[in-house]
Amino acid sequence: MLIEKLEEYTKVISEINDYSKLIEWINSLARELEVDPSIRTPENYVYGCQVSTWISCTIQGNKIFFSFDSDSNVTKGVVKILLDIVNGRSIHEIKKITFYDFRQIVAKLPTERQKTLQIILNKAHELIKQTGDTQ
């Protein structure tokens, strides 16, 4: 399922050859993202991103679910891809996911947008460690 989801997004992005259409598609993903404004707290703030960004996680059973918010629709759209891939997975599965797995998805984005995804993925891994689970 994880691989299929990555491949699905990779295929869609590979078919978009115009940067403005890519941003339009990413913005459409941002509109689909369910945001919880209550996560906009100092402990959920993600340092290092170009715009204000927040992420939190909850555990339901043995599955992890992330909540995300940002002042940028492009960031929201890119993170929507990440959340579609990681939400509902086990800690063990999420720990295996690296930025390299997203290389084809972010290849058409400017370096700063690529860095933002890397920073958010790093923060997600950090949040998992804070759960105290040693899987």
Model-inferred region functions:
Residues 79:
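Primarily the active-site beta-strand->alpha-helix module of PP2C/PPM metal-dependent phosphatases
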Residues 91-97:
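Short conserved catalytic/interaction loops centered on acidic-Pro-aromatic/His motifs
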Residues 86-90, 117:
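Ampiphathic alpha-helical segments that act as solvent-exposed interaction surfaces
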Residues 58-72, 83-87:
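Conserved interaction-surface patches within small, structured recognition/assembly domains
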Residues 2-52, 58-60, 64, 97-100, ...:
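N-terminal intrinsically disordered, cationic/polar leader segments
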